[in-house]
From Swiss-Prot:
Its main location: cytoplasm. PROSITE patterns: AA_TRNA_LIGASE_II. The gene is serS. This is Serine--tRNA ligase. It holds the Pfam family tRNA-synt_2b. ATP binds at R261, S262, E263, E348, I349, S350, S351.
Amino acid sequence: MLDLKRIRTDFDTVAAKLKTRGVSEAILTSLKALDEQRRTLLVQTEELKAQRNIASAAIAQAKRQKEDASQQIADMQQLAANIKAIDAKLADIDQEITGIITVLPNTPHDSVPIGADEEDNVEIHRWGKPRQFDFDIKAHWDLGEALDILDWERGAKVTGARFLFYKNLGARLERALYNFMLDEHLKEGYQEIIPPYMVNHDSMFGTGQYPKFKEDTFELDGTNFVLIPTAEVPLTNYYRGDIIDGKELPIYFTAMSPSFRSEAGSAGRDTRGLIRLHQFHKVEMVKFAKPETSYEELEKMTANAEHILQKLKLPYRVLALCTGDMGFSAAKTYDLEVWIPAQNTYREISSCSNTEDFQARRAQIRYRDEADGKVKLLHTLNGSGLAVGRTVAAILENYQNEDGSVTIPEVLRPYMGGLEVIKPR
């Protein structure tokens, strides 16, 4: 959530930055007007409360002196009625302000490229060269079915579209991948967490999913619970409402969890395969950092995600997302896209973001600065390390052989009992 004081004192800068994210200046002008009206009413109510206190003292003195206090009592009753009326106006204005400011996206960092959509993202670098095949390649869904390791037909029967069963060596490959990913992150100083897979609405608000993106989630009717769309939500909210000792920062968390997404608005997109599912595994990275080091931490986090792809020897590229393509809470985002041969393109497999103090303000996550003892908002970061199902898709396609078998990447073989190849059954 943006700082209302910043909007008030640096309106033009905030308006210019949010314009690059598609926010009309008229919305901010309306917000500023409401804020000014609120501040005026607060001054009025404080003045009235001071008058009420004076009237109350005058009534008490009159009663002690056994004098007629009926006029003072009438005056105080009128003051109380006026205060009540202003408080009601303030409540309405506060609700309007909340309704606007909670759906405004974060302001982009100065280094973020300005653009309207994914076409304006900027490629930073590439790693690895896409393999040149001398045979007709198959898509990962065809490979998975032929190898008897992925079953979409029964997933659709048991649940519905965009669900599947991993089976046999497919289940083992998925498990090998997320264990490998977690082990690599632990080497980089991350603490492993197994979080709840359901969170409450306050947690969804804290990380920015609510109220704006409610339609993208699965809520449990009759409860305050939501199935997590990403482990970012429980991991970040771990410190919601807390004040952390500044000496403990930065703090690194990692977790593997299922992610549940309704994929509202994705009808007709990626209807086959592992790219877009309602339920999928993802290894998440979350960091809590001081403002002065958060962008250094973003570079490190992105490098951690790249390291996984490099160890798996999967070609990828890194993009700096433009202002129009970044997520709601992000101030800066790098996307990692892995090469998918059957689609002859790169597809997103990780997104690493610095939200600065945007989530911390919503969730009230603060730290006590050891230098001056003051309590301040920290910066939160999050990134995929990696999306496991998409990594399975990339391995199946990049490591496929002419006979329909798939070679296991060397780094995963210890996690698969030394198995080197998945062969058709």
